[in-house]
């Protein structure tokens, strides 16, 4: 990474109002120096989004499913989840982006299924909260938001499935039906195979 100082101003020779960047100084940043303030960061209130997330988890009525969420969103992974970007460049590509995107998806999903009969509301919440959990393993929150080894070798969908599989083994009485339903949501959340999902949506909760 480098530090740059300069200014942006209108190009007086441009006919269409283009801007030009005038660089006064550029230098390498010393190794180990804190550069977190240089990273793009969400404009939303992180603390408010954390409260929204916790409230969503609290709405899950099935104890094993709620316990699974607690198992996954804890410790170091929780810290990575609230800090990580949701993508390298396509959407929510900034610090706090993954938390923001996840909460927004969950709230939208709940608004859609509010009046729908014969749907597992708990599974909708859990699936929405976990659909991109693999991005805590796929993308680094350091400068450049580069892909990790897991990101290059597996991608976030596979990483997410592995995280859920591992957590489900730690939760007593976690049903096989819920395990399959939750994993299906993660596998199918891109919608189509052409968009990266190994399978297409086959349950109401996944849709």
Predicted regions and their residues:
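Residue-level signal for short amphipathic helical patches enriched in basic/charged
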Residues: 60, 93, 119
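Short, well-ordered alpha-helical segments in soluble proteins
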Residues: 57-64, 76-77, 102, 106-116, ...
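Divalent metal-dependent catalytic cores for phosphoryl transfer on phosphate-bearing substrates
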Residues: 90, 100, 111-207
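A short mid-domain helix/strand-loop element embedded in enzyme catalytic domains
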Residues: 65-108, 130-134
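Extended, charge-rich, solvent-exposed interface segments
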Residues: 13-85, 159
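A general alpha-helix detector
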Residues: 52-53, 108, 163
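A ubiquitous short alpha-helical element
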Residues: 35-41, 92-94, 148-152
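OB-fold and OB-like beta-barrel modules that bind single-stranded nucleic acids
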Residues: 1-12
């Amino acid at each position: 990474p480098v530090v740059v100082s300069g200014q942006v101003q209108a190009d007086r020779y441009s006919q269409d109002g283009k801007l030009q960047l005038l660089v006064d100084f550029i230098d390498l940043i010393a190794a180990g120096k804190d550069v977190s303030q240089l990273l793009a960061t969400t404009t939303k209130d992180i603390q408010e989004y954390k409260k929204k997330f916790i409230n969503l988890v609290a709405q899950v009525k099935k104890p094993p499913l709620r316990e699974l969420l607690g198992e996954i969103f804890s410790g170091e992974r929780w810290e990575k989840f609230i800090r990580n970007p949701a993508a390298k460049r396509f959407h929510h590509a900034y610090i706090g982006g993954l938390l923001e995107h996840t909460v927004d998806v969950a709230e939208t999903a709940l608004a859609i299924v509010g009046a729908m009969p014969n749907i597992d509301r708990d599974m909708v919440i859990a699936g929405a909260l976990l659909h991109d959990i693999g991005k805590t393993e796929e993308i680094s929150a350091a400068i450049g938001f580069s892909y990790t080894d897991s990101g290059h070798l597996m991608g976030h969908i596979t990483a997410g499935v592995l995280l859920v599989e591992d957590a489900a083994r730690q939760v007593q009485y976690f049903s096989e039906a819920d395990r399959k339903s939750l994993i299906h949501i993660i596998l199918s959340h891109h919608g189509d195979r052409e968009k990266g999902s190994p399978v297409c949506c086959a349950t109401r909760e996944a849709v």
